[in-house]
Amino acid sequence: MDVKLIEQAIKGNQDACVLLLQHHQDVLYRIAYSYLRNEPDTLDAIQEMTIRCLTRIHTLKEPTYFKTWLIRILLNVCADLNRKKQRTLPVLQEKGYEEEVHIDLYRALDELEVEQRELIYLKYFEDYQNKQIAEQLQLPEGTVKSRLHTILKKMRKRLGGV
């Protein structure tokens, strides 16, 4: 994304900020939906993230970290919504005759804690490298690797070694 546009947004240009949000809207929607698993909560999270972005963009110190900063805001909003509702995420609704393996995989993903699902999502759905995940989540890279290993081991056990 254009650093100059980000700098304009930091200086208070709301049109620039809106353009930046529009540029990232697809990935932000996918991330929110992967956590919240329903459309209304996803839209609420996106709306709250947008408000926080517009009111706090002036606090962004490094324009090159805009996307990371934005995703972190969204992850915090999603965590807030989950805590507020104090509920577990429902299993994805099956549509038609999906293969049993896919259904089992969705169930295994749903059984993970939000933080674990976040790691899996960033690694396998967004194709982030371990180093990028570590930066995004503010964790040591070794911690990311070990947590991913543990999560995958747990999922393999749940899926019966698939």
Predicted features along the sequence, with ranges:
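Short, charged helix-capping/linker segments at alpha-helix termini
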Residues: I10-L19, Y29-E48, Q136, E141, ...
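N-terminal module of bacterial RNA polymerase sigma factors
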Residues: M1-D26, D110, K157-V162
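C-terminal flanking helix
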Residues: Q25, Y29, T50, E113, ...
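DNA-recognition helix of helix-turn-helix
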Residues: A79, K131, L137-V162
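Internal acidic/polar
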Residues: D2, D80, K85-D110, Q129
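Arg/Lys-rich amphipathic alpha helix in sigma70-family domain 2
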Residues: T55-E62, R72-V91
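A short pre-motif secondary-structure segment
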Residues: L119-K123
